[in-house]
A protein has these predicted regions:
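Short linear sequence signals and composition-biased patches located at protein termini or domain-edge surfaces
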Residues: 113-204
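Surface-exposed loop/linker segments characteristic of extracytoplasmic
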Residues: 45, 67-131, 188, 192-196
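Alpha-helix initiation/capping motif
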Residues: 33, 37-40, 108, 112, ...
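Aliphatic-rich helix starts adjacent to a transmembrane/signal segment
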Residues: 1-56, 204
Length: 204
């Protein structure tokens, strides 16, 4: 084989290899994107199941953090749009950690751990009866949850009486793909969930 023939053969090999890579690379990206989308759906399902199940079993909720560490009520904070404390047989606070994009789970004592990663939005809205228990539910204006009148709950914590009327929570959750390079291929996943407090006095 002459030098010219060798150069031509090398050029053809490079072109063929480039063509193969041009086909294989997008296919690999699609496969990775499909895997990441499946992972995102699983994370979303896990978050949705945990949040809705805990709210449904709750006696009441608080729109702020409660516990031995960084208790919002003790700091005079009685509303956070991205936080809910669920009170039942146990007390658990769920909140969005904005700087790390994580859904956090706090047990009210010393355990404060991430539950779901790559959460880009988490908000809680509340519904309560218009008057007596059993009447139509309406969205609760956050301002009414911090303006009193005030009472004490069973744990002797100060609480707005309107908070005790909450009998349904609307949860808005949005997750993103884990790999930044795949986010153009994998759209964020959104869900809005409604969970009624089955053990609330106002739900009876």
């Amino acid at each position: 084989m002459t030098t010219v023939e060798l150069l031509v053969a090398s050029a053809i090999s490079v072109l063929v290899l480039g063509a193969v890579l041009a086909v294989v690379t997008p296919v690999q990206a699609v496969v990775r994107a499909q895997g990441d989308a499946g992972d995102m759906h699983q994370r979303l399902r896990a978050a949705a199941d945990t949040l809705t199940n805990d709210v449904r079993l709750a006696i009441s909720v608080r729109p702020y953090r409660i516990g031995a560490v960084r208790d919002d009520g003790l700091a005079g904070v009685y509303y956070r749009p991205d936080t809910v404390a669920v009170i039942g047989t146990a007390m658990t606070t769920y909140y969005w950690k904005r700087d790390t994009l994580q859904l956090m789970q706090y047990d009210g004592d010393r355990s404060d751990l991430p539950m779901i990663d790559h959460v880009v939005r988490l908000t809680f809205d509340y519904l309560a009866p218009t008057s007596a228990a059993g009447t139509a539910l309406v969205s609760v204006d956050p301002a009414t949850l911090i303006d009193g009148p005030w009472t004490e709950d069973a744990t002797h914590r100060r609480v707005d009486v309107d908070v005790l009327r909450i009998c349904e929570v609307r949860i808005s959750l949005r997750l993103q793909a884990t790999a930044p390079s795949l986010r153009p291929l994998v759209p964020d996943d959104d869900v809005v969930l409604h969970a009624a407090l089955r053990n609330s006095l106002f739900a009876r």
